[in-house]
């Protein structure tokens, strides 16, 4: 495996993962893992660890950008994050007891469908609409849906970015930018926990691949987050939808190759 091949694969993986994270709060694991497994022959468990470590800084820089533009609900984000982290552990414990199924494809298919939804039925909720929900109700919803997301993340082994975006926009009635900002904020911590546990269990990764993935994903996530915060809602819905459809289709293609 030449260094040039490694650079090209990690660059393309970083572009896809970064755009997905910055525009839609998508977990980098959905894009990076299949590419590393398919083209660089990296062992699946390690590929997920590298993808999650790429997620940490990309999500953090995206969350910072959304926060700077006042598109982040920190209070409810923190409540949801605690539920997600706690029940991810429960989910992964139960997943060990149940026969393993390849449910990773489920999250990729969901990414594709969510992309179609944003193009066909854009989320046009405004910040004013969000004020109609009481703080208490919002907090309770954050706990309940955090538990559901965490359990599914642990059980399926997915980052949960798409699930969070779907629930925040459709069930909790968040405006799109605030939903993405809150999703990447939560994902910074879930990805960090996941990356640390992967490397603790599976050993150190290929540092060259890991470093390149982290840097490329970070750069493209920053670019996408800046563009997303400047866009008007309709354009953002369309851009987010197109990014998700393309990434979903590409990853399904990689899975077929693998």
PLM regions and their residue ranges:
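Juxtamembrane transmembrane-helix boundary motif
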Residues: 1-19, 33-39, 44, 65-151, ...
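Hydrophobic, membrane-facing alpha-helical anchors
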Residues: 1-6, 10, 53-64, 158-168
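Transmembrane helix-bundle signature of multi-pass membrane transporters/permeases
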Residues: 18, 48-56, 180-191, 244
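Transmembrane helix boundary and interhelical junction motifs in multipass membrane proteins
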Residues: 23-32, 157-167
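Membrane-interface alpha-helices at helix entry/exit sites of multi-pass transporters
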Residues: 42-50, 75-76, 173-184
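Membrane-embedded alpha-helical segments of transport systems
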Residues: 53-61, 86-90, 94, 186-193
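A small-residue-rich subset of transmembrane alpha-helices
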Residues: 54, 182-198, 208-221
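Short, structured loop/turn "capping" segments at alpha-beta junctions
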Residues: 126-127, 158-163, 174-178
């Amino acid at each position: 495996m030449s260094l040039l091949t490694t650079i090209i694969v990690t660059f393309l993986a970083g572009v896809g993962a970064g755009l997905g994270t910055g525009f839609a709060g998508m977990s980098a694991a959905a894009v990076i893992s299949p590419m590393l497994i398919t083209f660089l022959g990296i062992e699946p468990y390690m590929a997920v660890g590298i993808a999650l470590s790429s997620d940490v800084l990309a999500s953090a820089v995206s969350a910072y950008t959304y926060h700077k533009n006042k598109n982040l609900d920190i209070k409810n984000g923190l409540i949801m994050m605690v539920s997600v982290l706690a029940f991810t552990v429960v989910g992964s414990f139960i997943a060990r007891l149940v026969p393993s199924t390849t449910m990773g494809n489920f999250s990729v298919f969901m990414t594709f469908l969510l992309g179609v939804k944003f193009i066909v039925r854009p989320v046009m909720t405004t910040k004013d609409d969000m004020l109609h929900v009481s703080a208490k109700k919002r907090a309770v919803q954050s706990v309940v849906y955090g538990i559901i997301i965490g359990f599914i993340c642990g059980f399926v082994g997915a980052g949960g970015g798409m699930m969070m975006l779907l629930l925040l926009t459709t069930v909790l009635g968040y405006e799109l930018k605030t939903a993405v900002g809150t999703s990447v904020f939560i994902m910074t911590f879930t990805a960090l926990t996941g990356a640390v546990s992967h490397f603790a269990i599976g050993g150190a990764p290929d540092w060259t691949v890991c470093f390149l993935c982290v840097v490329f994903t970070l750069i493209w996530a920053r670019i996408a987050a800046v563009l997303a915060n400047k866009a008007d809602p309709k354009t953002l819905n369309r851009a987010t939808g197109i990014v998700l459809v393309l990434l979903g289709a590409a990853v399904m293609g990689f899975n077929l190759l693998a």
